[in-house]
Each structure stands twice: as C-alpha cells, then as structure tokens.
Curated annotation (Swiss-Prot):
Keywords: Cell adhesion, Glycoprotein, Membrane, Signal, Transmembrane, Transmembrane helix. Residues 1-32 form the signal peptide. May play a role in cellular adhesion. It is found in: Membrane. It comes from Mus musculus. Residues 603-624 are annotated as: Disordered. It is a single-pass type I membrane protein. This is Mesothelin-like protein. Residues 33-627 are extracellular. It comes from the Eukaryota.
Amino acid sequence: MSRTLRPSAMGSRVGALASPGLALLLSLTAHCSGPQAKGLPKGGLNASEANTWVRNNTSLLQNFWCLPASQLPREQLSSLIRSLASQRVALKAWQLSCLANLAAQLGLQDDFEFHPPNLLLFYDLSQVGDTNCRAFIHHAAQGDTELLTNLPNQRVALQRTALACLGGPHLQLSASDLWLLGVLVCDMEAAQIVTADPSVLRNLLRCPRLTVMQTAALNTLLASGKTQIGPPGSWNLQGLQALGLLATYISPHLWEKVQEAVGLDFFRSVVAACRAGQLSRHDARRFVDNFLESKATSVSSRPKRRTGRSCVRGNITAATLHDDLFLVHYDCTQLESCLGTRVLRANLDPLLQHPLPAECQRVVKAKLTQIYPHGIPEDQLHLIPSLVYLYSLAEIGQWNITSGDTVMILLASDAALDNQTEAVLQRFLDHNGKVTGALLVAIGGSRLCWMSLKQLQFIQPSEFRLAGAPDISPCPQSRKDALFVKAHEVFRNTSNVGEYYYLIRPYLGGAPLEELQYLAQANISMDIDTFTNLNPLTLKSMGVDSVRNLLGQNLGDLRKARNHPNVILWMHSHNMTDLSDMGLYTSPTQAYVANRPPNTAYPPSSLIHSLDPPGNDGVSHTSGSPPVHLGYLSLAVALPSSLLWLLLCQLPSGQMATAHRTLGPMALAQGSWTPEHQIPEKRSC
C-alpha cells in the first residue's frame, strides 16, 4: 500500500539551492533523519552554505545500502566509492561486502588505490595480479580486519595472499615486509612475531587486542633488548609512552627489571591518562595489575591480609586520593584499614577515578553498603559505574532511578553486566520512566538482548524506529526471536519491501523460516554478514535454491564464509552435489580448524545454540562492527536527482514489488507496484 507524500516543510527549506541534485540530497537526508537534522536555515541555502550544512551533518548520510546503489551506472558508482575513501567514511561489514561485489561486477576492483582500505578486505583476492599484489596488500593492510569476523575464509585468504606477495612464508619478517603487512600481523602466530624485525611493535600497536600467546611473544621481544627502547633496565618514560597500549601488556617479570623511578613515573602517567578519559579503565587496570604484582614481593612493609588489619600507611585523606601513586602506596588491605566512611562519602569520585583492582573495588562496595544500607542515592549512582557489576539484583532493586541519564551511565558498555540490564531498567520504569529511541541508542543494541519481554512491549513503535540499526548478534537466540517479533510488529506496514528489508535487517537473527522464504522471493540479495547471523536452526532448514535466491548477487560470498560455524551447519544438511554447484565442494570442518586466525573468536556460541533445546538462553559472543558514517558530498552535484533519490531511499518502478505487511510474512503481492510519482508516506532511509 502506497500513499502520495505531501511536500514536507523540511523539503521546502532547501529549495533555494544552486544544484538540484544537492537540494534533493539535503531534502532526503533531512526527511529521512527527522529530528537528527540540525542547523538548516528556514530561508534556503546557497551552494556554499549547503556544503557547510552537509559537512556538519555527515552522520545523516550513513544510510547507504546496496540494493538501490546497484542501479547506479559504472562511472557514478566509481565516484561514490572514491568519495567514501576521500572522506574516510567507515562502513559496516554488511555494507562493505555487498559494495565490494557491486564494484567487482562493474570492473572497478582494479582502481583499488582510490578505494577505502576496508573495502579491499572484501574483494575477490583471486583477481589480485602479481604486478599489483604488493600495492593491493599494503593498501588493504590499512583497514580493520575485525570487519571480517564473519568471513573466516576471507581472513585466512588475505593473510595467504599477503605472504605470497612476499614470495612465500618467511622465517623472519623484515622491516619492509612489516611495512607491507600492516595490521595483518595481528593475525599471525606468536612465533612469527618473536622472530620478526623489532619494528613489528608498530604493527602490534594497531591490533585491537593481543592473544595470550601474542602477549608472551611481545614480552619475549621486549626482554631481548633488540627493540628501539633497549633492554628493560635502560627504559625511560619516553620509551614506555612510545609503546602506547602495548605497555599495558608488559609482564610483572619485566617490570621488576625496570628502574623504580621510571616505573613510578610511568604509573603516574597511566593513572593520569585514565582520569582524563584518554585510556580505558580496562586497559589501565591490566597495566596496574601487572605493575602492582611486580612490586608485591619487593615492598616488605606491606602487612599481609591475615596478619592483622591495622592501618600502617596512615589514614587516607582527600589529598591522598588525588595522588596518582595512591595504588602503589595502599594495597587493598590497607585501603580497607585506612579509608574511613566519612572520607569515602566526600571523596567517592576521586577514589573511583583510579583504576582499582577488583579486590579494592569489593572493599569500596562493602564500605558503601555501610554508608547506605538501604540503597545508594541516585546522585551517587552516577559515580559508581565501575562498581555496578558487583551488585546483586536484589541490591539494584533498592535503588531509586528516576532519570534516563542515570540509566545511560549504569548501562554503559563498561559498567553493568548483561544480566543486570533488566533490573536497572525496571527501577527506571517503576518510577514512570520511558524507554526512548535516544536511550536505546545510548545504551547500545546489546542491552536489548537482556530486556524482559514485558519491557520490550513497553517500547513504543515510534521510539523503536528511532533505535537505528542495533547490533544484536551477541543476544541469546530466544531474545533475537523476541526482538524480531517486536521489530516485525513495528515495521510490518512498510509499503515497499526493499525499505522493509532495510529496517528489519538488524533483527533477522530471530526471523522464522517463512520470513526468510519471503525475502528470498523478494530478490533483496541479503549480504553475507546478515546471513551468517541468522538462526542456525532456521538456516539449516533452508534449501539450496532458497539460499541461492536469498543471497542473490552476493551468493559468491558463501565461499568467503564457508568455515563459519553457521555455514558449516547448513552445509552438513545438504548433499555435496548441490553444494558443488555453488562452489562449496570440499569438507569445511578440516579447513576451519586448520586455518583459524589467532584473533578470530570461533566458534561463537550461536553454533552451540543451534544444538541446544529451544529456549536456551546461552550467550553468544560474536563481535560487532565499528560505527558507520557515509559521505558522498561530491556526488551531490554530479548525480542526477533521480539517481540520488535511488541511492538514498527509493528503488525504480518495477524493480521491487510493494506489499502491505501483516502480522505474518506473506508472499509478494501480485501487481502491487509503487508508481514513480508516489512515495510511501513513512520514509526512513
């Protein structure tokens, strides 16, 4: 069902633009984003002002998706991709995978030097020639390989291609090799790191995390004294600071060899950075734990926990808590003995700005319970996000939470545990709080996983629409199912099936079989990232032809994900003849086990869910993706208005059937096409 859209007030405000294409671009982004648009003058804009407005509202242009973009001619798609690169726009995996396929279909892959590095990660590596191999790998190695979390085969192939460019596996990676490999070193084994040129530290700095074995390799390399900062006994503050986050992985054994004054100076700098928000508490606490462990045996004046609880170091005062070496002078036993409740009540904030070890956090929590036996006041809740994980559901039930700001602070990513989400939200709802779209965006999509079914029902459809595209891949399957039901209820009346898919896509991990069959008939060409996050049991029930139709032009990406646990499960449910027709012709399990990169967290527990009885609420740990932004201002003038409309919101007439969505998935409505001169009244790009 489609309805003619009346011109919006926002649309009329951009009518004075010099370029019709740019005028339409601003009109669409403002209309699609609603209240997010800001600073658009009522009297119209000239071309210069329009460019400024777009620069200030880049986040409005993040709604790129491949289905309408697939209609762009080669030259205009090329311009779009180059614009993404020049503006350093960070797309998500689901956008990049299909965009890479569009580029390949139009022969744009050879222009890789002008493309975003993240896009190169998704290209067909078999098309990379010997002559441009090194240039391709070096450019791709500036990207974020975490985007390939759901494409294990592509991640392994990327590393193999890189080593092939070097002439095969090396016993020792040289400085020039490491320059070429960039972030790809993060997927290499510890043995290769130990034997590499010491400049490998620059590569490791780009790793989002180090494995246990890589951490050991780092410490071996640092202990050798071959790096630029020399042996541990000669380290200085500048050298340690040059290590960046790598310094937080230094072992207690190495800290024992560092000059005491240098170690203490670095300790001060880490605590100061943590206080200033320049270093995460997680990273700071890793360093503090290692450093204090190295000092535990050398500080003989510290009393042992079981030898008495007298205060040896002196009573803790406000001035003491502002000392960046506070944790060096007071271990957790002395914190318990020397910190009075009066000082704690007046100085809770400066105390919790320190990256306290877990044992010290428990001491502080116990003292707060003495001060506030009937629950912590709301103004104090704002100060304790680092302690929230220690509180039981019963204790949270004593809190008075009346502000959405309090909820945001308590449910920040590094605060409450997942299973505390429901209790915190319930205290807010008990005080007539409202779960808004802004609140959902602020606390993150994964928090949706842990809301009760009743709480989900409290979310108004208008607010649910404003929640954006949350990443619910970490959710237990039962919650994914519930979230799909909620999302389907909200979006089911979307008249255009393409737009419906765009809105429902983040929730398809809980979609039933009939929904996926409906989408397969609709020719939406599901991206591989969304496909690998489908319910494994539902996916297992899909036939080869259904999967072929569901993936459409992205079918070739199955080979890049063939060792993903969910794809393995689906492949095992079909015969090899059918799979061979799709290019999936060898046993997946053996390759999966042998080729897993060290930083790939497999198998995710979504595979375990598939083997559990229905209703199992185990937690999946599939990682999410970086934030998305889209910018292609340079195309605003170049593209015809009709193509801008196509790119942002609408498909051309005849490309996609429209269907009035009812409570259950349904087949495409026969003959229900959207006329070119009509636009569905509810438009959200």
